[in-house]
UniProtKB/Swiss-Prot annotation:
InterPro entries recorded: C-type_lectin-like, C-type_lectin-like/link_sf, C-type_lectin/snaclec_domain, C-type_lectin_CS, CTDL_fold
Positions of short motif Galactose-binding: 119-121
UniProt record similarity statement: Belongs to the true venom lectin family.
SUPFAM superfamilies for the chain: C-type lectin-like
Tissue: Expressed by the venom gland.
Residues listed as glycosylation sites in the UniProt record: 134
Lineage, highest ranks first: Eukaryota, Metazoa, Chordata, Craniata, Vertebrata
Subcellular location: Secreted
PROSITE patterns: C_TYPE_LECTIN_1, C_TYPE_LECTIN_2
Segment forming the signal sequence: 1-23
Any single GO CC term annotated in Swiss-Prot or TrEMBL for this entry: extracellular region
Listed name of the protein: C-type lectin BML-1
The C-type lectin domain, residue ranges: 33-155
Assembly information from the UniProt record: Homodimer; non-covalently linked.
Length: 158
């Protein structure tokens, strides 16, 4: 009976909402968007440790992937609200082959790359992980050394 009640309420909410309701449940302090849940973490970690931290939540969790300017704007507002002045933020994009071939940790398509001017540059042949840059209002990206310590943005399928 409870399953039918939840399903019925979800359908009712979808019909009553102007945008439609997303019928999944994110943990209370996570941001729901496009069937996924997102959370920014202020603890500074290397890119690899941040990816490992995201994966510990459950299968299907990774550093976040962004696929449109609308996503970038929404996440810039979300990150700015939680990390005022706390530095750049790791996302799940990396050049694993070190040949300017950028890949997301969730294996989604690489279809949106809002790089800062003159980026990516693999500076000193040592920058292969991607961060959202704070002084661009968290709207543009830079490649950086994967060992740098940064806050990070996780995404999970719940």
């Amino acid at each position: 009976m409870g399953h039918f009640t939840f399903t019925g309420l979800c359908l009712l909410a979808m019909f009553l909402s102007l945008r439609g309701a997303e019928c999944y449940t994110c943990p209370i302090d996570w941001l729901p968007k496009n069937g996924l849940c997102y959370k920014v973490f202020s603890k500074h970690k290397t890119w690899f440790d941040a990816e490992k931290y995201c994966r510990k939540f459950k299968p299907g969790c990774h550093l976040a992937s962004l696929h449109s300017n609308a996503d970038a704007v929404e996440f810039s507002e979300y990150i700015s609200d939680y990390l005022t002045g706390r530095g750049h933020v790791w996302i799940g994009l990396r050049d694993t082959k070190k040949k300017y071939i950028w890949e997301w940790t969730d294996r989604s398509r690489t279809d949106f790359l809002p790089w800062r001017k003159n980026q990516p540059d693999h500076f000193n042949n040592n920058e292969f992980c991607v961060e959202i840059v704070n002084f661009t209002g968290y709207l543009q990206w830079n490649d950086d050394n994967c060992a740098a310590l940064r806050p990070f943005l996780c995404q999970c399928k719940y």
